[in-house]
Amino acid sequence: MNITRYISKAVLASSAFCSIAAVSIGTLTSCDDFLDVKSETVAKENELFETKEGFQDALTGCYELMSSQNAYGKNMSFYMVDALANYWDMNLPMGGSENADISEITLFDYESDDSRQLIENTYLQMYKTILQANIILKNLQTNGHVIGNSQLRNMIEAECYAIRAYCHFDILRVFGQVPQNATKTVSLAYNESTSIDEMPPFYKYDEFVAKLKADLDKAEKIMKEYDPVYNHTFYETFPNTTNSVSLSEEYLYYRRMRLNYWAVRATQARLALYTGDNATAHSLAVEIINAKSDNGESIVQLSDLKPSLDNGKTVIYPSLPSENIFSLSVFNLLTYTNTYFPLEKIQRSSLVISDAQYNKLYEGQVTASHNRYSYWWRRCTTNQSAVGRVLTKYYWNTNSDTGLAPNAYNNLFIPMIRLSEIYLMAIETTTDLAEANSLYNTYMRYHNVLLDADAFASLNDVKNVIIDEYRRELIGEGQMFYVYKRLCSPSILWHSTNVSEADYVVKLPLTK
């Protein structure tokens, strides 16, 4: 399989009928118009699922929907959700940021026209993705026999359950109530239907979480039997490498780029931690860290973020592809990350942190060797010579900043789950001080920081350090807001006022 062709594939016919179903209804003027669109949608659907390739294209379409700018390609990663975490300095660009939507989001203003539009676009895209996964699941029941390979058929089913759960979980983390001691309750739609003319049922928090667990359990059970990466390393599931395994279907390669067994386990760990089940979160995190292939190699390893030789070129991959448990390919990533993270002059569209923020972020760290400090940031100026720091996580080579690196996979993606986060989860949830110190020692060693002594004298020390580590590690990935929210933290670094419970509950859009 050609990796460049694979990750740059346009949204296919499946996405087209899903788009008609999910968003065009609002523009219809009569019942006849609606029925015409519905008939066209059904026709496209029936045609698509007549072949194995149609199912594959539909699933690829799900990931395309997830990787769009209205979902994880921007809003659910470095833009809207990281603005909720108050990472970006909205005042540093000359004249102030032109990103009015997230300027308001940073203040937890969910009522302005700009922020409401951003929220609505994101909400719709997430449910559009879920709807497409449901359509695939429905057609697997009625027409799955056209997929002769049972491993492929089962993996398509499992990935759809995983996609549905993954998207619903982040809807919960953005729009749902705080998970502990909530005084403001919120019911959310958990959509298991393919209907485009009926509102899905809404569920209370505990019911919604039960739905999430059920879908993740279904995905895990199937993937444990059929996913190649269950007993092979991620590297082995890339074709044409020295250790590539032989798989029955080309579509089963590149497991890191789609929801897989270990990504499901990691999502289960995230859910357990979010809902306060620290023991389960710890058990799952340690399981992932210790996971071995049939030949005894680690399924996934931490990245040391060092320059490496790739097809004859010395390159740096700041997004740490080798430790990604799940990532989304975004073939046009640099066409818009250049807008938000410019490597020369800071513009009004730029997402930046100030020098003061930068120093606070790495306060107390061994910055002389810390590889995130060295490779994730670039010092830039505005037209008025104000200084800020630009995140370089989504650039392929911070040494040259020019030309594509040889391996397209290593630079055209958004990290969704990384092993570094799993380490931090294990450190946060352990009740064994020695284990906390051992895990943290390993974690910091891969940051090129060698500790002379144990970092923690008590488990209380862990609590004091871990939030800073999450904040440093997860910037640009849309995860830090969820850390603050599950703790219902009364303060967020760089937010000037106390944060209330209501601030953590993004207002549901009015759209249907």
Residues of each region from the PLM?
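Membrane-proximal, proline-rich intrinsically disordered regions
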Residues: 30-86, 330, 478, 492-512
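Short, surface-exposed recognition loops and adjoining beta-strand edges that mediate ligand/DNA contacts
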Residues: 46, 76-92, 177-184, 188-189, ...
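Conserved, well-structured interaction surfaces
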Residues: 56, 99-175, 198-206, 222-223, ...
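Inward-facing hydrophobic residues that define packing positions of alpha-helical scaffold repeats
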Residues: 59, 130-133, 209, 216, ...
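Elongated scaffold/linker segments in the mid-to-C-terminal portions of large proteins
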Residues: 117, 207, 225, 259, ...
